[in-house]
Amino acid sequence: MFHALALFALAMNVAPDLEQRLARYKPVEMTFAAERFTPRERRLIDELIAACRDLESIYWRQNSPEDIPIYKSLPAGPLKRFLWINGSRYDQVDENKPFIGSTPMPPGRALYARSLTRDAIEAWVKAHPSRKKAIYDERTLVDANMKTTPYHVKYRQWLEPAARHLRNAAGFSDDKAFAEFLRMRAQALLDDNYYPSDLAWVKLKDPKFDIIFAPYETYLDDLLGVKTSYGAAVLIRNEEESRKLAAFQKYVPDIQDALPLPAEDRPSKKGHETPMEVMDTPFRAGDLRHGYQAVADNLPNDPRIHEKVGSKKIFFKNYMDARVDYVILPLGKRMMRADQATQASAEGYLTVVLMHEISHGLGPSFARRNGQQVDIREAIGPAFSGLEEAKADVTGMYALKWLVDRGALPKERLEEYYASYVAGIFRTVRFGTGEAHGRAEMMEFNFLSERGAITRDSSGRYAVDYGKMPEAFAALAKELLEIEATGDRARAEAWFARYDKMPSDLHAALDAQKDIPVDFDPLVPFREGVE
């Protein structure tokens, strides 16, 4: 029998096309070969997963806390599954519009009091400059009276058990450096000082087991664009694929120096550590679990870490395989000119994603405004997430051509890389511009089309002018890097306003591909849920 809240949810004008929305996601079994691991390693994995579950509970409270009792009360079925996929009642593929009820998504989610607006916050901070640091801190909540509460205080109920599980996991680790990192990260959960453990994390050397476990990304914050949400992923090293990436590491400092950006905005050897790991992930939580399924990450985001030791590039091999097999290649075959569609490949897409993640760690660390260094996220505001994703895409493609020109990548595969990039765009823009990656790639598509690098033929298929791609990428990389370097919010907003609308012909072409999923829904062999 339904709980009263579940009945209430079903009576709240649930979207009538719910099952069609759910069908946009291809259920994919994510396998886990338990027999590969020793009993101690299994205990380690179990403790890490238990810790991830605690962060899951926090994420829902940051995102849409009113949906927790509804989710928990619903029986298994389409509505419960779709709530889980999105982590809230807001459909990430439909510009974050509600599929339960009609209340619009609060731009600050539950990170700010709902009555607050960006203008009101900025005006208050201008009148109370001593409070700016606390208001703009990436790990504080802001109430209607502009009082701030640190995450480690607000969420202690879940952070304390999460820290305990991390310490337990450390006791089962045979890797002393990883065990020490886990203990340091456990402490960071309880005081919000992630800097020491982030340093230790980047310095880990080829760990067999690893974990993403922190409030890193700002995707939930559409108000100021600075508040982070908790995310987690248990990682197991894919040794064979990791070895293939080692060759890229030595080129990162030279790519940084080659960017179309003034020298004063290029940290000289930023990202020089650049560890790259190809991992399989059996369990994810929080912002890594819901909506857009990340196939790679570049972390941490702290520019102080980037300056000192670089950042870590992580590629989720089992998730990337699912996306390529079920979404990108099928979509490319339908949308692209036949001869170019066959050039798109899984390996080409992996290379494009690799360059994207490397490029998150390249470019300016801070914006320069009025002779001072300013945090880029703070300077750009809500447009930052889309801007940064676009910068990583475009700078990555610029860097890819640089590597080809120097013989680090085979020249004969350049067209394969470009075709794979464009096939990936068709997948990403289906998320709409309410999602950072979708907004970024919609802008990229329109800019490249304006430059004649992407065209549409009389049959409705899209074609890539390979000769025009390098110049177009160089021009766009220069624009995006300059926006970040100057922290010019108005320029960023005007740029997206000009380029982030989906053309009607592309909309119609994508509408005709509804039998191809927008993304996959990972089905993991471990218990998921929110407490």
Which residues are covered by each model-predicted region?
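Sec-dependent signal peptide recognition
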Residues: 1-7
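N-terminal mature-domain "stem" immediately C-terminal to a signal peptide or N-terminal signal-anchor/transmembrane
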Residues: 14-95
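Long, well-structured alpha-helical subdomains associated
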Residues: 397-494, 498
